């Protein structure tokens, strides 16, 4: 996960939790709801970044296997 994106997701989760808790303690339902929403956005961003990371890892694995196959074919043709 890109560091800036990871920090942004974490910031949203923490900020959301603070707002949610503050809203609960003060009885401010709007602030509590805003905090829950912000926290969920942070979790969604984190999930999206995890998917991006896994897709990138998979693409690297496929490229590596492809290159290994090409090298193997070249090696066989050289004999």
From Swiss-Prot:
SUPFAM superfamilies: Hypothetical protein YjbJ (SSF69047)
Superkingdom of this protein's organism: Bacteria
Region (Disordered): 1-30
Protein name: UPF0337 protein YhjA
Transmembrane segments: none
Family: Belongs to the UPF0337 (CsbD) family.
């Amino acid at each position: 996960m890109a560091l800036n994106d990871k920090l942004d997701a974490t910031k949203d989760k923490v900020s959301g939790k603070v707002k949610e808790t503050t809203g609960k303690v003060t009885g401010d339902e709007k602030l509590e709801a805003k905090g829950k929403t912000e926290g969920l956005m942070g979790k969604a961003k984190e999930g999206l970044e995890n998917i991006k990371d896994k897709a990138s890892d998979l693409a690297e694995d496929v490229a590596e296997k492809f290159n290994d196959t090409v090298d193997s074919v070249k090696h066989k043709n050289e004999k």
